[in-house]
């Protein structure tokens, strides 16, 4: 197969219809179309408004704690004996992950649009916590849809959301995971169009969500690019991030897309292996179709039915991925690779013991890829891994899997 011709820039998408090549778009019910167009108009206006930018910057700095640090993981780097590994410390943000970046931007949009009720979906609970947090900060009611399976395995985050005043609605349809929670949130939105803002947590969904979530998360890569130039005097050789829906990854990747010297690697949930259906590696083992308002790579059976998938990480068990990632895969700019549950668990423990940092299981997938790659690289090479969140929420899951009684 001929290698696709590289575009002049990888940063120009999406087009007016929300397409990244053949991916993206807005495949939604007619009742939602006016809302989607209203959101797009509000976003186009907001992103060119200095006041909006100033308010978002102030909240990011004084409320969320940005910029997050770029930290040289010396213990892990020396243990592996190859490339220098840097962590982009999104785990240090308020609420403990990258999710707050997007939530701050979207709550300001909701305010501009005059919406008085916030709904959100969540998998690992991090986006639910971030949504509940900013809803509390702005005095708005918040309903969070969460798969019943995830409610069970993420109890600390469920309690946090309730503490913050949010109503958590468990969804038992399907496998009771992120896909099902998103379905319910979309149903709610259709029936409450006047007053409700749907605060999507990942870079998927109908246009303009993939674009606006990417833009709000790109602060990660913008900072990391500047920080590595200050600390190493050059760009990294490799950047790595975990990909579920793909918001933390696109946030890191986007500012580096046109830097040809930087290799970019997205890490999918390989679960128990790609041979069966117990994984969530939609780009390694899926094919394009439509889900949640956009065309993208999805896990499907022979009849085109969406599969449920599996991952040890609640934040990665989504059977699809943001459309921009699908386009970046097909264009050849980004490599997407699967990491198995046991590899992520090993990396979780290794990071904890060599760095004194307990990473989220999502981030542990990215670290596992670093564990594979770094030893094959020279000691003069530099790698950035996005530490997308902290692992407090996962200690019970990991403890159970390791046979510990917590």
Curated annotation (Swiss-Prot):
It is an enzyme of class 4 (lyase). It comes from the Bacteria. The lineage of its organism: Bacteria, Pseudomonadati, Pseudomonadota, Alphaproteobacteria, Hyphomicrobiales. It catalyses: (1S,2R)-1-C-(indol-3-yl)glycerol 3-phosphate + L-serine = D-glyceraldehyde 3-phosphate + L-tryptophan + H2O. It comes from Brucella suis (strain ATCC 23445 / NCTC 10510). One of its GO terms (cellular component) is cytoplasm. Its EC number is 4.2.1.20. This is Tryptophan synthase beta chain. SUPFAM superfamilies: Tryptophan synthase beta subunit-like PLP-dependent enzymes. HAMAP family: Trp_synth_beta. The keyword Lyase applies. Pfam families: PALP. Pathway: Amino-acid biosynthesis; L-tryptophan biosynthesis; L-tryptophan from chorismate: step 5/5.
